[in-house]
């Protein structure tokens, strides 16, 4: 139980310290989504949905860009999403290593 509590404490503290960067990446994802949505004539909700599905690299295929600019921005959205995910995973790994080293 102590390992879990320590992990959560370290993980949340790490996320807090890098929250400005994470918020910037989220803002980039939202802005690109709205640009693509306007360019493709999607609703704002559909554009936001597409942006986050693309950023987490799921890509259901129900919305897909048809225009060249939108296709380029979709690649950028996926790259930003991979960076976002990598940062969160790195923080989680650091928290796990530190908490395990302390208690195990």
Write out the residue ranges for each language-model feature.
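Membrane-interface helix-boundary signature
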Residues: 12-19, 70-73
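Outer-pore turret/helix-boundary of cation channels
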Residues: 20-50, 65-68
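Pore domain of cation channels
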Residues: 46-49, 53-103
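Membrane-interfacial helix-loop-helix connectors in multipass membrane proteins
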Residues: 4, 103-104
């Amino acid at each position: 139980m102590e390992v879990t509590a320590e992990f959560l404490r370290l993980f949340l503290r790490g996320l807090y310290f890098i929250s400005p960067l994470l918020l910037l990446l989220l803002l980039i994802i939202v802005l690109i989504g709205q640009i693509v949505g306007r360019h493709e004539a999607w609703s704002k909700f559909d554009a936001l949905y597409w942006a986050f599905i693309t950023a987490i690299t799921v890509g259901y295929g129900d919305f897909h860009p048809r225009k060249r600019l939108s296709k380029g921005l979709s690649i950028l959205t996926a790259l930003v999403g991979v960076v976002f995910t990598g940062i969160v995973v790195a923080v989680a790994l650091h928290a796990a290593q530190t908490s395990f080293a302390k208690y195990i």
